[in-house]
Amino acid sequence: MNDYNVTGTTLGDAFAKLPPNWGQLTGALLFLAACTWIYLPAFDGVPAPFAGYRSPLEPAIVAKTRYAFAASDIISEGYAKWKSSMYKISRHGGDVVVLSRKYIDELQNAPHERLSSIKGLIKNFGGQYSGIDLLDESDIGTRALQTKITPNLTKFSDDMRDELEYALGRDMPDCEDWTLVPLQPILLKLLGRITSRVLIGLPICRDEKWLDAASQHAHNVTITQIVMKAVHPIFRPFLNLVLPTVWRYKSAVRRGKAILAPEVQRRRNLEDNDPDYVKPNDLLQAMMDLSTPGGKDSQPEDLAHRHLLITLVAGHSTAAAGSHALMDLVSRPQLLEELRDEVLQVLQENGGNWGKQSLSKLWKMDSFFRESQRQNPPSLLGFHRIVQDPAGITLHDGVHVPYGTHLCIAPHSVSSDPAVIPNPDVFDGLRYYEQRRQKPDESMKHQHATADKNHLHFGYGTWSCPGRFLASDELKMTLSALLLRYDFKYPDGSSRPTNKHIDEFPYVDPETPLLMRRRHQGGTGV
């Protein structure tokens, strides 16, 4: 058989013309490339020191592996040394430049074309291997939350309360006596149902096949991005083929599309043919209305996939926040009773009715959630941005940041700094309640869902978390119902577990149990 011919030269001829030692040269180059990856941190042109290295001669791969298990210490070390400037961190998921918050004003509202929040999220969440890169093609999900959902949260209060009642009746275990219950799976179900009621509405929000697809998608995407970030990019295409969590999240996407895509088409048919048709009030409809007619983001399967991604971000992060908060509260029985009394008082003042206005009166609970988030953030790093300007950007102090650089800020370090927050090591559940009482004209600044320079866990500026107001309302409504209906305590000899970390992400064992018992006094109220 003849060798394959390219432009008149056979492969055999081409190989014959190579230097006799080409194999050794190729091997040497590959060895050099491997050594460079193992020993040297990436060079990005930013004049900043690295945190996390034990010595100048330490291989980069060692520092990257250390970060996977000691991110909290490394980020804290960098902040302590360089909080007024910037520092770098070597990670398997890509090196980052951690900025001082003094730069935040000049960066917060930079246009997407120069500094991309979406690309920062995508890179930090597994990129193309988690499916989340779809968000870079259109921002209709973010715009739908910002313009259609958040301004109209009062209209969702009755639906949210109705779904919470349904969830409590369906998903809560029988706890007539003290019963050991895994906390996070329960909260995932309760909050997942409320979120789905707002995002997709009846009847699909109660379709167990949809709920399972959304849950499996979120769970497996999360694990996939952790695994992908832990290995060198050269191995990721192979892992993408063999990793079981990739198979599972892609299966969940297919199942989710099979449910939502026909729903999109059904709504469009009704809108075109039924003059009496009233559009549903949910996120899916908002995304449909904002999509580009005839564009990719208007296609039913594209809308379905985007919806799954928003459900992922909204559901799991809110449930994790709820788990941390309830564990913090059970550790402080006096504060628990104080919050329970506040709920009863607000309900009494509102004739037993529950709505957005009632939630806004829960100042103590709002403060408690903000304090719990301060000590148990969703991530130790935030405000992720990728420099998109081909010429790079130049900061106000003359530091030049080249194209492609991954920037971020360390919100937990900021809110743990005694120069920023008095007594930051003390958990003070009423910290922000007292600040609102003492300075009523600054009340908004200290609310749970407010993003400011001292509390950057929801981001800052134009690209702050668009679902934070919905999440805050869901958490307050759910905790209120649980406090009025159940007593909680830790098993004998147990206490609030300490947080663990994978990279910069804090977590507790999702199966952490609490003892629960149904209350038969005080009414339900919610």
UniProtKB/Swiss-Prot annotation:
Recorded metabolic or biological pathway in which this protein acts: Secondary metabolite biosynthesis
Q: What general EC class does the enzyme of this chain belong to?
A: oxidoreductase
Q: Is Magnesium set as a keyword in this record?
A: no
Q: What is its EC number?
A: 1.-.-.-
> Gene3D superfamilies from the entry?
Cytochrome P450
Q: Which InterPro entries match?
A: Cyt_P450 (IPR001128), Cyt_P450_E_grp-I (IPR002401), Cyt_P450_sf (IPR036396)
Compartments, record wording: Membrane
Q: May I have one GO cellular component term?
A: membrane
The function of this protein is: Cytochrome P450 monooxygeanse; part of the gene cluster that mediates the biosynthesis of terpendoles, indole-diterpene (IDT) mycotoxins including terpendole I, terpendole K, terpendole C, as well as the kinesin Eg5 inhibitor terpendole E. Terpendoles biosynthesis begins with the synthesis of geranylgeranyl diphosphate (GGPP) by a yet unidentified GGPP synthase.
Question: What family is it from?
Answer: Belongs to the cytochrome P450 family.
Protein known as: Cytochrome P450 monooxygeanse terK
Q: Which source organism? A: Tolypocladium album (Soil fungus)
State the organism's lineage: Eukaryota, Fungi, Dikarya, Ascomycota, Pezizomycotina
This chain is encoded by the gene named terK
